[in-house]
């Protein structure tokens, strides 16, 4: 099978790459000066989110800027996020394919405002298969880190059910997730 373009992605036998034209379009953008331009930016980035580690955290300043009650105030945090994302996209790695039945690994990450996961395969070198991320709603931001971690895992299983059905996925984290998931009684007594 050769290389080709499908649904805006470049497909190769060894994996999937973001369309370089989409990356160039983001890199050509100047600093947004109004909410409409921020919406254009976030739309362009959303099309590339599967290639961006911790997407929700990286784009949070832009989404905060779009909140109606806050008003439009492009600040240093937005400027840094904009520059960092452009730089990140220039170095974006190819997402590799996985063979049926191959063991996969998932790292979960939590922050104050988002949960993220990366699905990897490991053949001596870890290679990303898929990145996912979720911005936390107000109530979720008050979860304990372990609860956010479980939320991250639930979100990952909902976003990537085909990987969990076709592969053994080892979830890697610094938290004692296994002991929590084995508990039979989840009531607070």
Predicted feature residues:
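Acidic, metal-ligating active-site segments
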Residues: 110-121
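Flexible glycine/proline-rich, aromatic-decorated loop/lid segments
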Residues: 13-18, 121-131
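Metal-dependent nuclease catalytic cores in nucleic-acid-processing enzymes
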Residues: 45-48, 146-166
């Amino acid at each position: 099978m050769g290389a080709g373009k499908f649904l805006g992605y470049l497909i190769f036998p060894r994996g999937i790459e973001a369309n370089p034209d989409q990356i160039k379009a983001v890199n050509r953008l100047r600093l947004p000066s109004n909410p409409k331009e921020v919406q254009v930016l976030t739309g362009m980035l959303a099309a590339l989110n599967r290639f961006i580690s911790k997407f929700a955290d990286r784009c949070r300043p832009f989404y905060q800027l779009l909140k109606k009650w806050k008003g439009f105030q492009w600040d240093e945090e937005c400027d840094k996020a904009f520059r960092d994302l452009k730089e990140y996209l220039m170095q974006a790695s190819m997402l590799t394919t996985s063979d049926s039945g191959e063991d996969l690994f998932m790292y979960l990450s939590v922050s104050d405002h988002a949960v993220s996961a990366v699905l990897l395969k490991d053949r001596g070198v870890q290679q990303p298969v898929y990145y996912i991320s979720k911005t936390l709603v107000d109530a979720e931001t008050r979860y304990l880190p372990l609860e956010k971690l479980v939320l991250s895992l639930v979100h990952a299983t909902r976003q990537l059910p085909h990987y969990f059905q076709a592969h053994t996925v080892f979830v890697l984290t610094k938290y004692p997730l296994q002991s929590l998931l084995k508990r039979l009684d989840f009531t607070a007594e």
